[in-house]
Design a protein with these regions (language model features):
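Short sequence/structural segments immediately N-terminal
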Residues: 1-256
Length: 256
């Protein structure tokens, strides 16, 4: 039997769609067995069909995601063949970036979505006759390749990040437009703050306002080495300077 026809119940009942019956999404004709043969041609609903224009799901910005996806290289090159379900299995999909505080787990989860096709010859050939390129060879120019692969997601370098409302960019760019400039990430104004660390930054800002978000954000350049002792000494030094200025100001005021 085709593996695509087997639904893992453990994964399904942990997914975001676990409360639905099969026939909520599929034809009622599936209630009979054997299933009619013409059901193989059943048109599959996409995310917008259920979530578009629904205020209950407005915070997820499905319309903005759909627009970005439509402009992506996946959609423009493969049109109707490439749907939401090529990356997001409706039977196992669960929200991750918005709920998982463990960045490493988010990286693994999201990169697995990309690698399910880009490291699988069979799935890759479903959309093209081209040979599936070797990921390691194609990224041979990247310094510390293994560290990058385990520390950032594919979408950090391969998507356009314009819409501030969406957590994960869906406009996948052609390979010749991928980020290759180190300072895009390794700078105080890192693009990672608008992608991988976006949710954490938004949470800090919403909890304490804009200024708290600014003052509690990371001051280190992403990827730089850190020293806990120097961190503590820096805080003590800054606190001492502020205290000294305050005492000096108070004494001057008293003398006047």
């Amino acid at each position: 039997m085709y593996s695509e026809l087997i639904i893992n119940p453990d994964l399904f009942y942990r997914s975001n769609h676990r409360q639905f019956k099969c026939t909520d999404c599929h034809s009622e004709d599936y209630s009979t067995f054997p299933h009619p043969g013409n059901l193989r041609m059943e048109a599959m609903a996409n995310c917008i069909d259920c979530h578009g224009g629904d205020e209950q799901y407005a915070k997820f910005h499905f319309e903005a995601i759909d627009t970005a996806f439509t402009e992506s290289v996946h959609s423009t090159k493969h049109s109707t063949e490439f749907t939401c379900w090529m990356c997001h299995d409706a039977h196992t999909y669960r929200i991750n970036a918005r709920t998982n505080e463990n960045i490493k787990e988010t990286i693994i989860y999201d990169n697995t979505i990309c690698l399910d096709c880009h490291s699988d010859y069979r799935r890759f050939q479903l959309l093209t006759d081209k040979e599936n390129p070797n990921i390691l060879t194609k990224h041979g120019w990247l310094p510390n390749q293994e560290l990058h692969f385990t520390s950032v997601r594919c979408v950090e370098c391969h998507t356009e990040k314009k819409n501030d409302s969406t957590l994960v960019a869906h406009k996948v760019l052609p390979k010749n437009k991928a980020v290759k400039n180190c300072k895009e990430c390794h700078s105080s104004n890192s693009t990672l703050m608008a992608s991988l660390y976006k949710y954490q930054a938004q949470e800090v800002r919403s909890a304490g306002g804009f200024f708290k978000g600014v003052f509690t954000s990371e001051s280190y350049v992403i990827g730089a080495a850190r020293n806990y002792v120097l961190n503590v000494l820096s805080v003590i030094l800054i606190a001492g300077v502020i205290l000294g200025i305050t005492i000096h100001s108070v004494l001057r005021t008293i003398k006047k």
